[in-house]
């Protein structure tokens, strides 16, 4: 554990180019629209008649001419385009700050999703938030890299709009190895070897709902469909697990969970492991569904994670509410 943010200030400066320096991948995969549209056990595949145009603008078809499956694909593509837009805007803000001679964009400027800014109105004015911003900015100036890269710090919120949330999977802090963290709990970019916890999630997924185990660990499809993949701490130092714990992230992510509980109804909260289950006190169990199991790590997966059937249970709950189920296939 590290000291207060005031003691961790700036050693040698590093540029954003260094912060965002590409990492070495196991293989280079450039997802196309075909690979990003949901596929599945439920099966929602990409369709040339539905999707985004060359300009990235979403193309609408006449609702009366679309099947249920086509409407599902159209909705997925719309939110995928929105997620990509939010990431692009974050990158632009970082580049603009650099062009103005500023080493980094302000932390609050990287939360792009309007629905979350509205839902969390006032939260970014709290004293803890100002202290958190100072801490993260001092870490960005430091010699030890932090993960994920700045434009992906709020990827969970920027990928899953507040009004889109159907389920919440709570993680701890980001993966601390180079290239692993992408701002979505448990997820790694395509081309990066899935960690053991994610492999165990895929094994349970296969046994529970019959989905095939994917060749990658990118959970973006889940996020775009309404599964909020939220870590309780959103940044970490390279090779130093929990190094940004108790620096201000927990009050913020607690506020996210509490806001969902207070302002929405019928959300499925998936809590794996003791750390995630501690967050159940923030959730109104009379309004929402809470699923608990052991953490999927190699040390605890055999103590209650395997066989929990949380994926099928989530979809059963969503169907009872009249909502479309999650296509868990990656």
What are the roles of these predicted feature ranges?
Residues 318-319:
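Short loop/turn segments that flank or connect secondary-structure elements
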Residues 305:
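The substrate-binding groove and active-site-proximal loops of carbohydrate-active enzymes
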Residues 1-147, 329-330:
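N-terminal intrinsically disordered, compositionally biased regulatory/targeting segments
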Residues 86, 90-101, 109-268, 275-278, ...:
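A polyanion-binding, active-site-adjacent surface
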């Amino acid at each position: 554990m590290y000291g207060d943010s005031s003691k961790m200030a700036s050693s040698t400066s590093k540029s954003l180019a260094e912060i965002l320096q590409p990492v070495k991948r196991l293989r280079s995969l450039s997802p196309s629209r075909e690979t990003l549209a949901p596929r599945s056990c439920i099966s929602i595949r990409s369709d040339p008649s539905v999707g985004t145009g060359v300009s990235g603008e979403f193309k609408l078809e006449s609702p009366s001419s679309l099947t249920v499956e086509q409407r599902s694909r159209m909705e997925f593509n719309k939110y995928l385009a929105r997620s990509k837009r939010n990431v692009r805007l974050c990158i632009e803000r970082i580049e603009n700050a650099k062009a103005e001679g500023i080493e980094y964009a302000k932390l609050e400027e990287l939360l792009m999703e309007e629905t979350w800014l509205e839902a969390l109105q006032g939260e970014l004015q709290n004293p803890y938030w100002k202290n958190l911003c100072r801490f993260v900015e001092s870490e960005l100036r430091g010699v030890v890299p932090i993960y994920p890269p700045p434009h992906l710090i709020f990827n969970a919120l920027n990928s899953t709009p507040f009004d889109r949330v159907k389920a919440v999977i709570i993680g701890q802090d980001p993966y601390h190895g180079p290239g692993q963290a992408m701002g979505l709990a448990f997820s790694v970019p395509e081309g990066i070897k899935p960690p053991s916890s994610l492999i165990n999630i895929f094994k349970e997924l296969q046994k529970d709902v019959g989905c095939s185990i994917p060749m990658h660990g990118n959970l973006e499809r889940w996020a775009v469909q309404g599964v909020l993949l939220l870590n309780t701490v959103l940044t970490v130092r390279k090779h130093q697990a929990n190094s940004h714990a108790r620096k201000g992230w927990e009050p913020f992510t607690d506020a996210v969970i509490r806001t969902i509980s207070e302002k929405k109804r019928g959300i499925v909260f998936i809590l794996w492991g003791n750390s995630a289950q501690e967050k159940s006190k923030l959730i109104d169990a009379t309004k929402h569904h809470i699923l608990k199991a052991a953490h999927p790590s190699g040390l605890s997966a055999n103590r209650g994670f395997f066989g929990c059937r949380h994926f099928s249970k989530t979809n059963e709950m969503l169907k009872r509410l009249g909502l479309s189920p999650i296509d868990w296939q990656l």
